[in-house]
């Protein structure tokens, strides 16, 4: 079977169409650094109450912070402070 100019052009356009359609598909994962809108800044407020003691459980710090209308709460590494995290626009 001889390769004619018509078949070669059709083949090239087919390959070009396939490559361009694959390249233009949207990605499902979000790329870091390309967020839409302004970046949110984090505000951290720490309390030295005994919410992070092992007897009370580490979830008590998160519950304490959520009751104070913060987004979440984390204990420090030495379990001495409960730090509440809130995001500012």
UniProtKB/Swiss-Prot annotation:
Where does the UniProt annotation place the signal sequence?
1-24
Source organism superkingdom: Eukaryota
Q: Name one GO cellular component term.
A: extracellular region
A single GO BP term for this record reads:
defense response to fungus
Q: List the disulfide bonds.
A: 46-84, 52-75, 61-82, 65-83
Q: Where in the cell is it found?
A: Secreted
Q: Which UniProt keywords apply?
A: Antimicrobial, Disulfide bond, Fungicide, Plant defense, Secreted, Signal
Q: Which family does it belong to?
A: Belongs to the DEFL family.
Protein name in UniProt? Defensin-like protein 103
**Which lineage ranks, top first, belong to the organism behind this chain?**
Eukaryota, Viridiplantae, Streptophyta, Embryophyta, Tracheophyta
């Amino acid at each position: 079977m001889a390769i004619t100019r018509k078949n070669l052009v059709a083949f090239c356009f087919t390959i070009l169409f396939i490559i361009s359609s694959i390249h233009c598909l949207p990605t499902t994962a979000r790329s870091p650094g390309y967020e839409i809108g302004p970046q949110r800044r984090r505000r951290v407020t720490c309390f030295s109450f005994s919410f992070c003691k092992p007897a009370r459980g580490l979830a008590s710090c998160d519950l304490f912070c959520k009751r104070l209308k913060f987004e979440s709460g984390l204990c420090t590494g030495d379990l001495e402070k409960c730090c509440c995290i809130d995001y500012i626009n």
